[in-house]
Amino acid sequence: MSRSSAGFADFFPTAPSVLQQKRFKVTRERPRPKAQIDSEHSDESSACPTETRAILNLSNGGASLDSGQISSTDLKKTSPESSVEGSASSTAGDRSALSLSVAQHGANSHEARLDTLTPLTNAESSPPQKANSPRNKIAEGIVANTTIDTKSGINPLHTPPTPQSQGRRTGSIRGYKLVYDPDTEKRSSSKEKRRKPRYVDIILSEQNNCPPDPRLGIPNYMRGAGCKQKRKYRPAPYTLKPWPYDASSTIGPGPPAQIVITGFDPLTPIAPISALFSSFGDIGEINNRTDPITGRFLGICSVKYKDSASFRGGGPVLAASAARRAYYECRKEQRIGTRRIRVDLDRDGVVSERFVARTIESQRMGQKSNLQSTEEVKSDSETKKNEPPPTAPKGPSGKTSVRPIVAIPEGPRANFLKPVMPSLVEEVPILGQIKRDPYIFIAHCYVPVLSTTVPHLKKRLKLFNWKDIRCDKTGYYIIFENSRRGEEETERCYKMCHMKPLFTYIMNMESQPYGNPSYERSPSPERCRAEQRERAERERLKREVGLDIEEEKRQRAVDLDPCQEVLTIIIRDLKDKLLEDVKSRIAAPALYDYLDPDRHALKRKTLGIADPEGIKRPMFRIDDSFGTPDSRSGLSDARRPFSGSTPNILALPRIRKARHLGRTDTAFLDERRKQPLRRREVRPLYHRLQQLHDVDDSDDEQRTPKDTDEQDSRPPSRMSSGTSESDDGDGFVSEALGLPVVELAGSGQNKEPDEILKDNQSVGESSQLESNEISPELRKRKRASEELEARKRQKEDDELFGINPIAEAEVEGTQIIATPIAVDINLEVSEAALSILPKESNDNRQETGEANHLDFDGIDVTSSTIEKDRRGILDPLDDIDNAAAREESRTEVGWRVSNDEPRPIVDDDDAIIMDLDGWQNLIKDDEDLHFLRDILVGYSESNVGNLSAWAWRQKEIKALNHPGDVGPLRGGTGIAGYYVPNTTGAARTEGRKRILESEKSKYLPHRIKVQKAREEREARAKNDPHTAAVEAARVAAAKNISKSTSRSTRVNNRRLIADINAQKQALPTQSGDGDVLRFNQLKKRKKPVRFARSAIHNWGLYAEENISANDMIIEYVGEKVRQQVADMRERQYLKSGIGSSYLFRIDENTVIDATKRGGIARFINHSCTPNCTAKIIKVDGSKRIVIYALRDIERDEELTYDYKFEREWDSDDRIPCLCGSTGCKGFLN
């Protein structure tokens, strides 16, 4: 039993030869026609014995089957069913049919036998029997008629080879071909259309057994000729006829009118050149170019033509036509002299300038090369002169000595000796000369300092890119390039050579990759000059501002009206005094009167609250500060003209305990009778409830003055026991009732109205009390005589000191005229007027009434005036319990019939906007309101909540939209040009169109409102000189404010960097340590800023502290991209609707994009007069964009800088500038 060996195709199925064989088999294995199937039925009988023999051989385990014993054709002829299936199947189907028949035969003969088709196939992978197979039926019949002795066991069967595909027989019908179709005939009659189509059989022959590919019949099909397009291939665009230049309609520069000639001899005169090129047109200018340094000709000539009306008796010739003709005729074969020239068109002179620059550069290079060659020739000649003659004897080496022995010269020849090689050890310390260059230092204690050591050290460190090696007495300095590469090279040299030997020494190195750590950068001369200029400018501006302020002060002093200033000061003081007087004289007594327990007796009785003890008499009273001092205070003040005569308005009213409350028979006491000393008055704490003075008042102003006057210093009219009844009762009546007040004749005192009233009351009261004890007439005469004597003494004193009696009273809105009167004053007070007084005992009420009748008999006070005052002062206090406000009286308008012509009562204005104010203005009376209600009957009510709150909210919204406008309006809420109507009626039907930047600028109501407010403020400042002076003073004060300098900060940053570098050297060197310990100086120097809404555009950046000029503010950070990527992103931003792109160019190839990744520096707006500038600096070898201050910037000032967009002259949509500064250019581009 043998096994077939695997072939080349099994191991290399993808080999080209194997693939070609497979393609060949596929072309051969094509389905056969039905005609061949009918011819094969006759061969069935002959095919059966063959198949029987094949199966017997397989069952006997004989030799393996090959293609010669059992062919695929014989197997296919066993039965009609198998033949039909085989004609439509592939080679694999034939092979499977054969194997199934054999396997079925083996399984029927020997049940315990396993047949294998392949060496790796058994019964588990493929079942031995298969139902309903025609091959099984044939195999069973054959096996039943034969008796074959086979041995039991597993006999592996050889896999039959792949049979070749069955080819079709020659002469068989392959198909049908339509040769006549009446439907497709164009010129056919109705009879011909009735004919039937004719078909012709396609017979298979030897030539067309494998029909050729019809596509190969197309010429050059493999080269693409089969899919030719109808379009014509055009390797170059059409050559169109150029349009003639028209200066009136063409935009841009015209055709060139100038040519440049090169290639001629530089020594050629200008005459032949001019003669040659003047034949083409009139020459306007000819220029033979020369070297600007040496003045020699370069062989380059520029010829510029001009338009001529008639050239050499002919027609007009344009300058462009003459230049074009000269270019086309002289560019190839034209010669000047013996050289061929070259002519080029030169529109703007750029070509000639390029030729001149190139020629000058080549001449410079040629001169340098010639100079070097001459120097080499001279050196060679000098060496040859010093060589010995050829016949001189040679040395032992057989070569001439390169360095001949020269005798030491004597005398004058000693001057021609070469100087001695200078020592490499420098006397000046090198460390002070190194600024920022990285270096490595080797101290002299490790390697001795010698000049001969420097070349050896250079050779030792030749693997590193050092810039220079220098030495002084302290040691050696290996200096590297001042860049990031130099720093890395310094670190690499330190790592590889530190503590390594140099001859017999050890190189103990000290690395400084960031230069001299103790170096402090001094300002450059340019910066010093710039600072000096700025300082001089600031001083000049300061002097000018000072001069302007002084001039303004002098002008104001000239224009100042003293009367007006005095009037202003008086009005201001009157207002302050009136406020304090109202607090002390009206508010405080009214509050105390309201808090009187007698007023609330009915309420306590209703609520069942017991009466407090001691309510019969008030335990405290308010003693007026203007009534307690003696009446001669005016005299004492007049005698001291430089002392303050104004009484302390801000002092609190003095509250003291009333004495002798039980006495009702108080009489006028004798002036010789001394009163007992007063006890220390106790001041209750509830006086703090009265805010009668400011918080900033001093303690002396708030302290109540004590009554320490002696009795002798008082006038007789004031020497009384001073009971609380007279002070509280009568004084309050005079104040509350608002009675007219006059001053007695010859008083010579500055008194308030209540003081005069109290003096008169005290006089009458004392006389009345004294008359109860002594005879009334005697008491009156005695009292009158004493009073007259006192007044005479006071008048004499006033005349002695030259003081005129003046009485003033300052009350807001009321002018009180003090007139000296020498008549008796009578007052008739009705019972209704007295009923408003506080409730007191009968005795006190009687005394008060008598005093009033005695002192005021001549003045009639009607009950209406008293009632009005009572309503204005006391009624609000009574209405607190009832919580109801009285409605003020409204002015009524009386309407009458017009006399001349009929006129409407009210002219309705249709332009008024019908908002809340508009409706209130429209409705004039109750009739209008009634009609409005009738109109709104059919409408449902709106739920607006609280009506008052809703009305207040509507008016607040109106105030926000129309600041400063009150009442009805005649213009709608909107911005001019904000709402643009659509031509089609709706925005959705407009389509896509570009919105101009000028129109976008109108969509900034916030900016427009701020701009309007700014313009109004500036206009008011211009009209008001006081505001201008205040603003100038504020600017001057802001300049004097000390601003923090960043010099100390930079010094601290340098020290911190040095410490970090020292720590980096001490740490183990690993990848990434440098990035972890990298120090960003820009973050440490950043100023505190914030972003907020800007009046210029959208968001803005504001300073949070004062920033000095030339200080760094912030770094502009973002994503670093190339220029091509930035252009692509800008287009994407425009398409996606991002209105603002934050692209900042660093150089020609790099752009910072902060649109989606960046800091708050991108919010800085543009201004034509900015306060900042952007600079590009290098930090650690990389370029950064940093914003610096151009001038001193105050806190909360917006930061701006100039965007510096390129000017777009031919742009239809320029970006408008919204900065609003005085130097605004109007557009960004």
From Swiss-Prot:
**Could you tell me which species this protein originates from?**
Aspergillus oryzae (strain ATCC 42149 / RIB 40) (Yellow koji mold)
Q: Where is the Post-SET domain?
A: 1213-1229
Q: Does Nucleus appear among the keywords?
A: yes
Its family remark reads: Belongs to the class V-like SAM-binding methyltransferase superfamily.
One Pfam family per UniProt: N-SET
Annotated keywords? Chromatin regulator, Chromosome, Methyltransferase, Nucleus, S-adenosyl-L-methionine, Transferase
Q: Which residues form the SET domain?
A: 1087-1204
Q: What is its main location?
A: nucleus
Its EC top class is transferase
Question: Where do the annotations place S-adenosyl-L-methionine binding?
Answer: Y1203
Composition-biased stretches, type Polar residues, lie in: 57-73, 118-135, 144-153, 362-374, 759-774
Q: Which SUPFAM superfamilies match?
A: RNA-binding domain, RBD, SET domain
PANTHER family hit by this protein: HISTONE-LYSINE N-METHYLTRANSFERASE SETD1
Protein name per the record: Histone-lysine N-methyltransferase, H3 lysine-4 specific
May I have one GO cellular component term? Set1C/COMPASS complex
Q: Where is the composition biased (Basic and acidic residues)?
A: 26-44, 375-387, 523-541, 691-715, 784-796
Composition bias (Low complexity) maps to 80-93
Kindly state which reaction or reactions the protein catalyses. Answer: L-lysyl(4)-[histone H3] + 3 S-adenosyl-L-methionine = N(6),N(6),N(6)-trimethyl-L-lysyl(4)-[histone H3] + 3 S-adenosyl-L-homocysteine + 3 H(+); N(6)-methyl-L-lysyl(4)-[histone H3] + S-adenosyl-L-methionine = N(6),N(6)-dimethyl-L-lysyl(4)-[histone H3] + S-adenosyl-L-homocysteine + H(+); N(6),N(6)-dimethyl-L-lysyl(4)-[histone H3] + S-adenosyl-L-methionine = N(6),N(6),N(6)-trimethyl-L-lysyl(4)-[histone H3] + S-adenosyl-L-homocysteine + H(+)
Name the gene. set1
One BP term from GO: methylation
From the UniProt entry, list the residue stretches annotated as the region Disordered. Answer: 22-198, 362-403, 514-541, 620-656, 679-733, 746-796
Gene Ontology molecular function, alphabetical: histone H3K4 trimethyltransferase activity; RNA binding
Q: Does the keyword Cell wall biogenesis/degradation apply?
A: no
EC number(s) recorded for this UniProt protein: 2.1.1.354
Q: Tell me the compartments it is located in.
A: Nucleus; Chromosome
- What does this gene product do? Catalytic component of the COMPASS (Set1C) complex that specifically mono-, di- and trimethylates histone H3 to form H3K4me1/2/3. Binds RNAs which might negatively affect its histone methyltransferase activity. COMPASS recognizes ubiquitinated H2B on one face of the nucleosome which stimulates the methylation of H3 on the opposing face.
